[in-house]
C-alpha cells in the first residue's frame, strides 16, 4: 500500500557471488513529504560479512536531514575480492561503526567512528563542509594500537641490498629534482586533520606517543606538531609548504 511501510528481501549475484539485502523502509507517501522523517533499516550480507544501515532521512527527495547509524563486520576483508574482482590491500577480520549526520549533502559529519582491523583500533570523527569557498575537511583520529605489519610488505635483506646497489650505480647523485614541485593540488581543499597513536608497530620499528597535526588553508600546508618517541628518544619535526604561481 502507498501508506504502508515497505519490507525488502532482495537476493542477487555479482561476479557469481550471492548478495542479500533485507530490512524495511518508510511508507512510500513519506518520500514526498519534506517534513516527515523517512525511516530505513537495512542489512546487506555477502561473503560472510554484513553491513547495517539504520536511521532516517527527513527530506529524501533533496537528501536533507540524514541521520544514520552505520556498521560493518566480517571475518576477512580479503573476501570482498570475490565482489570487486581485485585483491584488497587490507586483510583480516574487521568491525567498523560510525554515525552519519547531514543537514544537506554539502555539509555532513561521521562521528563515533570505531574501526577494528586485526589488532589495530582507530576511533575519531570526520566532517566535510562544501559551503566554504573551497571544500573544508575537519578530522580527528586516535589509535591506542596501530599495527601496520599486516599491511606492509617486508622485503628480504637481499632485495634491500640489490636496491641499494642500483642507487649506487645511478649516474646522478641528486636527491631532489631541480624542477619546482607542482603544489596546485593544495588549492583544491582546506583541511584540519589530527592523528594520535599511543603505539605504531612496523616490521623494524615501533613508534610510541605519535602525534601529527595537518593544517591546509589557501594553498599553505603546515604539518605541526609531528612528534613521537622512537628507540627511547624523542623526535620532533615540522613542515610547511606554500603553493605559489610561477
Language-model region placement:
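Gly/lys/ser-thr-rich phosphate-binding loops in alpha/beta enzymes
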Residues: 113
Amino acid at each position: 500500500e502507498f501508506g504502508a511501510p515497505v519490507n525488502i528481501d532482495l537476493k542477487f549475484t555479482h561476479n557469481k557471488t550471492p548478495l542479500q539485502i533485507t530490512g524495511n523502509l518508510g511508507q512510500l507517501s513519506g518520500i514526498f513529504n519534506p517534513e516527515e522523517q523517512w525511516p530505513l533499516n537495512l542489512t546487506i550480507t555477502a561473503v560472510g560479512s554484513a553491513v547495517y544501515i539504520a536511521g532516517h532521512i527527513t527530506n529524501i527527495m533533496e537528501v536533507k536531514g540524514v541521520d544514520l547509524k552505520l556498521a560493518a563486520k566480517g571475518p576477512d576483508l580479503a573476501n570482498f575480492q570475490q565482489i570487486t574482482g581485485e585483491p584488497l590491500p587490507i586483510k583480516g577480520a574487521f568491525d567498523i561503526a560510525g554515525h552519519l549526520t547531514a543537514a544537506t549533502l554539502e555539509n555532513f559529519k561521521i562521528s563515533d567512528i570505531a574501526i577494528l582491523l586485526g589488532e589495530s583500533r582507530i576511533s575519531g570523527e570526520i566532517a566535510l563542509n562544501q559551503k566554504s569557498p573551497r571544500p573544508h575537511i575537519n578530522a580527528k583520529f586516535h589509535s591506542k594500537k596501530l599495527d601496520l605489519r599486516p599491511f606492509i610488505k617486508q622485503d628480504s635483506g637481499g632485495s634491500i641490498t640489490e636496491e641499494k646497489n642500483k642507487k649506487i650505480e645511478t649516474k646522478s647523485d641528486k636527491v631532489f629534482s631541480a624542477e619546482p614541485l607542482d603544489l596546485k593540488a593544495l588549492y583544491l581543499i582546506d583541511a584540519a586533520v589530527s592523528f594520535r597513536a599511543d603505539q605504531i608497530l612496523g616490521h623494524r620499528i615501533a613508534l610510541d606517543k605519535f602525534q601529527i597535526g595537518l593544517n591546509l588553508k589557501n594553498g599553505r600546508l603546515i604539518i605541526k606538531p609531528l612528534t613521537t618517541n622512537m628507540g627511547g628518544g624523542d623526535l620532533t619535526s615540522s613542515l610547511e609548504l606554500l603553493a605559489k604561481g610561477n
